[in-house]
Design a protein with these regions (language model features):
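Active-site beta-strand termini and strand-to-loop segments that position acidic
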Residues: 71, 95-98, 222-223, 248-252
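Surface-exposed cleft-lining segments at the edges of enzyme active sites
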Residues: 82-83, 108-124, 159-163
């Protein structure tokens, strides 16, 4: 049985000032994946006994970035998608394990005014193709901030956000294509109807206090892993970022 955690920390140095180290230790995951680390190599001395860490930094300072802490030695580590257009922002790390691939991702935000929506569409297609290729050789676990609320149940105010970044028809359709390509949204696998549970809240308008949030952080799993999934959780009680950690437990 392995426990995996994914958390968009919205700046790891800031999160460390808000109790990250204690939270990490308490959660005691086999794999702990981070998005939006917002740092460069050497800016933070962070290590945990029993874990090896892998980092993918954005070239732009204080932006994006991903990391994985693992108790288990991977066979191979890959950074990025192998596509130059996508590989300057530190958005993807892949660990090849004996029985599966683990991919963590910080999906590009389409931004205000949907300035980056066209790029996002290209990203979604290329990322889906990347996962499908991995899935041909081993099952895949995918986690991270996918920057999309899949259905109306996945955000507090679907009607007012209909054409906003993260809830456009185009982004939602691309997410559905990813599921159709052979992946399971693990939280919905266990809790298909659960409402009012989110993983991100704006810092504005007392959104977290009012639970006016979005579920945009996911663990996806290859459909072949369905019978091995044991539990999925969203840790809404954990603060330290505008996102909260999400979790999956797998018998693998």
């Amino acid at each position: 049985m392995i426990k995996l955690i994914s958390w968009n920390v919205n700046g790891l140095r800031a999160c460390c000032d808000k109790g990250f180290r204690d939270i990490f230790t308490q959660l005691d995951a086999d794999f702990f994946c981070l998005q939006e680390t917002k740092m460069q190599e050497g800016q933070l001395d962070l290590s945990f006994e029993g874990y090896t860490s892998y980092w993918n930094y954005a070239e732009k300072k204080g932006y994006s970035g991903t990391a994985i802490f693992t108790k288990h030695q991977p066979l191979q580590v890959t950074y990025g998608l192998g596509i130059d257009e996508h590989d300057h922002e530190g958005r993807v790390i892949t660990l090849e394990m004996e029985k599966f691939f683990l991919v963590t991702v910080y999906t590009p935000n389409s931004q205000d005014g949907l300035k980056r929506l066209d790029y996002r569409m290209t990203w979604d297609d290329d990322f889906r193709a990347y996962l499908q290729k991995l899935n041909q050789s081993k099952p895949v676990l995918v986690c991270g901030d996918l920057n999309v609320a899949h259905k109306e149940i996945d955000l507090k105010n679907p009607k007012t956000n209909r054409m906003n970044a993260g809830f456009t028809d185009q982004e939602r359709e691309k997410f559905q294509l990813l599921l159709d390509a052979g992946f399971i949204d693990t939280f919905r696998y266990f809790y298909p109807e659960q409402t009012n549970i989110y993983s991100w809240w704006s810092y504005r308008f007392k959104a977290r206090e009012k639970n006016a949030g979005w579920r945009i952080d996911y663990f996806l799993a290859s459909a072949s892993l369905a019978d091995k999934l044991k539990e999925a959780k969203i840790h809404t009680e954990i603060c330290g970022s505008d996102h909260c950690p999400v979790e999956v437990t797998v018998e693998i």
